[in-house]
Amino acid sequence: MRTSLVYRNRRIYELLMRGLYRTHYAARFTAIDELIPDGVRVLDVCCGPATLYTRCLRDRSIDYTGLDRNAGFVADLIAAGGHGRVWDVRDETPLPAADFVVMQASLYHFLPDAAPVVDRMRAAAGTAVIVTEPIRNLATSEHRVVAALARRCTDAGDGAQAHRFTETTLDALFDRYGSRVTRRARIAGGREKLYVLTP
């Protein structure tokens, strides 16, 4: 699996994300942290460097497991005291059961049809699914060089992703779940949108 430098190194990944989100970086994680009570199992799908765990959940009474296809990220998570498994969500294996199933800024990897992944997350969740996804993206910039560079930097090993969600297309995806969507809100200075769904 050939990945961009950003996805090969946790520190570079974090540095890039901090640059993109600036003062709103921490808000990406606290918005999720506030929705998760103590004493539950959390499954973080496509967890990347597991920043949700290391920043928010590690010191709480939460049974956290992160899944990611990047073995280096998973090894870092385990070294930090969490549970992690190398897992390619594309293989359609049922996801491990948990109370809360989370995905942050990774749903675009499953375009053009991300609904089957959301359905598998719902099947694994006992209480809720929490999804956050960018709705403002450099990869869709009108500046061709900026867009091409952003797509290349965010290649997680499945090829540069040309497509991203807008707020309209993301809302359309979650509209199909009707009343099962119990919350939707812009977070991180309006760069991302958060959705909470019941199983």
Which residues fall in each region the model found?
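Conserved Class I S-adenosyl-L-methionine
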Residues: 182-195
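Class I SAM-dependent methyltransferase SAM/SAH-binding core
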Residues: 49-91
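Conserved class I S-adenosyl-L-methionine
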Residues: 1-36, 39-48
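A conserved beta-strand element that flanks and buttresses the S-adenosyl-L-methionine
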Residues: 102
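Hydrophobic adenine-recognition pocket in adenosine-nucleotide-binding enzymes
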Residues: 106-107
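A short, conserved alpha-helix within the catalytic core of class I
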Residues: 110-121
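C-terminal alpha-helical "lid/dimerization" subdomain adjacent to the S-adenosyl-L-methionine
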Residues: 132-176, 183-185
